[in-house]
């Protein structure tokens, strides 16, 4: 899948979110890379080929009243293209996995724990 096609699926996933969630996506950027770099691997405590996505930043649930009073760098959601592609056999599987990873990382952005994200994805 081309990078452009991959990014289009990410955009569609975000566009199809319920409005109440979409409106909360503030000061966050989505970054597509083939693999995580050393800093991201250290943060996630995993191997290069196992990580499909990673959220870095201050989750919404932990932002205090002073958040945004001063310029802040955007939170980042990394989506690791080559790792996701490696886990899928068909294009349909790939599309579903991209959507799942994007939703998973948005869950962390919203402040959900790993267990909460996994439960929410079962119902989505």
Regions found by a protein language model. Name each.
Residues 1-97, 109, 115-116:
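Active-site rim/adjacent substrate-binding subdomains
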Residues 114-124:
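Post-HExxH zinc-binding segment in Zn-dependent metallohydrolases
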Residues 101, 105-109:
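Catalytic glutamate of the conserved HExxH
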């Amino acid at each position: 899948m081309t990078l452009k096609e991959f990014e289009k699926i990410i955009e569609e996933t975000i566009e199809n979110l319920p409005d109440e969630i979409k409106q909360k996506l503030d000061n966050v950027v989505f970054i597509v890379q083939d693999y995580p770099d050393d800093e991201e691997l250290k943060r996630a405590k995993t191997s290069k080929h196992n990580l499909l996505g990673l959220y870095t930043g201050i989750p919404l649930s932990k932002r205090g009243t002073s958040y945004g009073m001063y310029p802040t760098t955007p939170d980042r959601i990394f989506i690791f293209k080559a790792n996701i592609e490696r886990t899928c056999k068909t294009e349909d599987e790939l599309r579903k996995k991209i959507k799942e990873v994007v939703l998973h990382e948005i869950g962390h952005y919203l402040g959900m724990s790993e267990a909460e994200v996994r439960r929410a994805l079962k119902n989505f």
